[in-house]
Amino acid sequence: MNLQTPTVRSLIFIDELMVEGTSKGNHMTIAVLLKQVPDTTAKISVIGGRVDENAVSKWSFSPYDEYALESALQLKESAGGEIVAITAGPARCEKLLRDAAAVGADTLVHVSAENINDFDSIQVQNLLAAAVQKSGASVVFCGKQAADTNAGSTGPGVAELIGASCVTLVSEVSSDGGGYTATRPSSAGHEKVAVSAPCVFAFDKGICEMRRPNVRGIMMAKKKPIETWSVEDLGVDIGANGVNIDSHSPPAEKPPGQKFEGADSVSTVVSKLRDEANVI
């Protein structure tokens, strides 16, 4: 399978716009693309110009992917179908899949790529697009961007590679059985975009928060099998790396705060808040 570099193109949506797609039957299979990133509360260490992954204390879902997963679960509950959770990366990413299974994902797919941090965005998109096609899904949910890179290219890139319609900045998706309607922000408030499969939805923060697993869900997730696919299994040529990151650098540390005690310091505190912090 040879997947080519996606063509960059702009899509402008208007209220009640219908984008034609190709239907693949009544059974709905939703592929949810998930990325494991350092938790927003985890301390990041940089050694030799690279993030030290061994020092990351906690890994979690990329936040926008949580909205995509929860929206897929709600669509499954209202319209039926099944959810295939797909992630690409090293072995530690399997925990992410089990977390997805604990809240309702039906099939778990781990695309094994220990060196995925050496891939550029297009290589990752080629990998994910091949996994989506192998899964048989005609509908794809993902976050609008990853919390670690903020690239925002996965949704449009995968859509281009699999020949699907793409709607970005989505907050909600519904289905009437014959197509899908996505809600997204507009200059006038909100707009509804109607599409048919195959289609890709890239989610912004929506009206729903990620549900928490119950004990039964957690126990069942531990037993659920994970399908592991290699790059060779997918039969895809991901191409050469076209973008190399020279180095990472942490932000400058904030200066230590100042502490004041006693009534005699009130005038000093007020002066600093007014003249330095500009908050009063």
Protein language model regions, located:
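N-terminal glycine-rich FAD/FM-binding segment characteristic of electron-transfer flavoproteins
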Residues: 24-280
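Short, Lys/Arg-enriched N-terminal segments with co-localized hydrophobic residues
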Residues: 10-27
